[in-house]
Amino acid sequence: MSPFSETSVLLLPMVEKCINLLQTYGVSSITKLRQIHAFSIRHGVSISDAELGKHLIFYLVSLPSPPPMSYAHKVFSKIEKPINVFIWNTLIRGYAEIGNSISAFSLYREMRVSGLVEPDTHTYPFLIKAVTTMADVRLGETIHSVVIRSGFGSLIYVQNSLLHLYANCGDVASAYKVFDKMPEKDLVAWNSVINGFAENGKPEEALALYTEMNSKGIKPDGFTIVSLLSACAKIGALTLGKRVHVYMIKVGLTRNLHSSNVLLDLYARCGRVEEAKTLFDEMVDKNSVSWTSLIVGLAVNGFGKEAIELFKYMESTEGLLPCEITFVGILYACSHCGMVKEGFEYFRRMREEYKIEPRIEHFGCMVDLLARAGQVKKAYEYIKSMPMQPNVVIWRTLLGACTVHGDSDLAEFARIQILQLEPNHSGDYVLLSNMYASEQRWSDVQKIRKQMLRDGVKKVPGHSLVEVGNRVHEFLMGDKSHPQSDAIYAKLKEMTGRLRSEGYVPQISNVYVDVEEEEKENAVVYHSEKIAIAFMLISTPERSPITVVKNLRVCADCHLAIKLVSKVYNREIVVRDRSRFHHFKNGSCSCQDYW
């Protein structure tokens, strides 16, 4: 007997029968829902019936994404008096889930104005989800105050929604305030605040929170692991990352593709290319993200030719289509290996074969490709031919290349463009000052310094991070705040002496102060990465590898010094600066002095 037959209809009151049909067939498709809706109208059920409308709206909103919200709203608009808050909540939830926060808020305001119903414990989490989609922290604060006034602020799932809202909006201070005031914190709360710190430039705080969570006996899940690995990758906390890897193996999370991809990214971003390749080979399942992660990882670590070979293998055997990010990695590899011709060929293939329209990042790679090869005039012509306005990164790339290759006129032009887009970035002033200093144009150096003072621009201090055990140590230039400072500086003195015996002469051309040579030499001796390496030499076993994460570009003097340290002390040293990795071994660097 058909569920829509007249005989079966007579067995139950019509509204109840239609609701039963919805419960039986409603989750299958929009077609079934339309049939049941039409069936109800044909058999005399009023289109304003609230009970049937409630169920129909629920099943419409519950359909696979994207649900037919316009249809659901039409059903809602026909209900004469929607006095059931469930109906309002369902529609608000539907709009929040598809990212239509404007309609969600419009419906909420309509609810308050109508006076038919009051928001309940479920209304605000759905509304907060809509704010989260908008990433509007001010509106979120308004909703937060309404939640408190309504008496729902102590409910854990409301608190978790608020916590996620602030973290997603980048307001980690407010997120932590909500978290700190929660009398009971479940795993969802810990995950939200850890991820908030990890994704908003506070990886150290994320790791500290994980340590606290672990001490309270709360077991991490896959979401925690992803956030934790992301934080480890950002500050080069390889030891902790490896511990997380061991935990993943123990609980079976290595079978989770997303977690494995993030772990792969960790090894690549910590300069551990061999571990990344081993993990990649061991992964049972791989997607385009896996391949792209390793391709980009090889590229930024200076193994550009390997990155290109891996890309060719992916194309020929795996049947996976590269994405925009894959080509960023390939173009980056060509740029940092000086493969200009190959870079232009891959750019052509991206557009013509894969129909990927280049974004600003791809054009930036092409400018970098020419600029690094010393073709700064061609790089400038390429910028002028771009179909979009160059951003500050592209002009900064040109400025950096001009300072390296000594084109002061074009460097000054690039800086003028940068000043219009981002006037107070100290690195641009420093680049130009370095170029003037290398040319001994001290009056121009002084002009730049005076302009920095006049504009209130302060140079970003260089810092270097290293990890010993499970602790990350930070060093600044000339830093003597570390408890082992005396031993560190004694090692630094010994290190400098041994390097001099190998023929090391400090590279001081970019020390942009017109002072005596000895003072300039002292200035470069105490750069943060040298202090960090001296600390690692006294804190780790002989011949063990050293990893340093630096926030600025490695200067020419430190690059030369670290090459010699790797030879004299028989250490493999990986330095991740703001643009790439340098693998120092036996007196040479993977960048082949091309950075």
From Swiss-Prot:
Region (Type E(+) motif): 470-500
Matching Pfam families: DYW_deaminase, E_motif, Eplus_motif, PPR, PPR_2
Gene3D superfamilies xref list: Tetratricopeptide repeat domain
UniProt region (Type DYW motif), positions on chain: 501-595
Keywords assigned by UniProt, alphabetized: Repeat
GO molecular function per UniProt: RNA binding; zinc ion binding
One GO-annotated biological process of the protein: RNA modification
Region entry Type E motif, spans: 394-469
Transmembrane parts of this sequence: none
Start and stop residues of the PPR repeats: 84-118, 120-154, 155-185, 186-220, 221-255, 256-290, 291-317, 323-353, 359-389
NCBIfam families, per the entry: PPR (TIGR00756)
Entry's family note: Belongs to the PPR family. PCMP-H subfamily.
Protein name: Pentatricopeptide repeat-containing protein At4g21065
Species name: Arabidopsis thaliana
